[in-house]
């Protein structure tokens, strides 16, 4: 009963010896090893979550949550207010300028955010809208909240166009107050932020902004119902997503002086921490 019987016959064919192979101890050892691996994996997972959780709490304690652009009280002027050739719409960079000045062109020609509204006009989006019982995806608030700068009508300037997609102010905040002051001779980044500019240069605030659509928040969330209607699965990793989007800024000495600088490992860790916090907020 404790193993597998093995029978041996002697040369004369009369004597035989029955032995039992000790299989139970071997099986028990394998089970113990498996449990050990499981315990180790569990320990590593708990440790990782504890570390990330600690990072979350540290950053949340140090940084007050700013209002996201969708919920700010500022006037949103639209892309046209930024796209002048002497502002951010130059075809090429200006060598003696403190900024590149071709930011709009980079966004328009290379950034997927510029095409976010157009996605709502695709056959797939139309099918998703139909499955949800909506007339059109490009007019539905639950779609526009993340595929455009869908601020209330009373916060839209006459030059504002929904079809601009995830435009300048969807990430940088309504420019109603800072559009004039940010080019003044005595302008400072601190004052621009005080006038409504969103701090996308800070990894914590950038992660919170990106996750509000690429995962969801209290204002907008890709629910199970939307996923069931055919919406693609959501995924996000701050450092990778930041690196994949064409930069419309240059991290030079002036940038580091005004805004600081973060390496990829730091941005990745902060992104993971903020993603965990966002998931916990959704669960709780």
Language model regions located:
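Short metal-coordination and nucleic-acid-contact micro-motifs, chiefly zinc-binding Cys/His arrays
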Residues: 75-83, 139, 164, 206
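Bacterial N-terminal signal peptides
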Residues: 47-59
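Cys/His-coordinated zinc-binding microdomains
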Residues: 86-88, 147, 172, 214
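Boundary at the C-terminal end of the N-terminal hydrophobic targeting segment
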Residues: 60-64, 76
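Primarily the internal scaffold of c-type cytochrome electron-transfer domains
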Residues: 64-70, 91-130, 157-166, 174-284
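Short cysteine-rich clusters marking metal-coordination/redox-active sites
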Residues: 82-84, 143, 168, 210
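Post-signal peptide N-terminal segment of secreted/secretory-pathway proteins
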Residues: 130-169
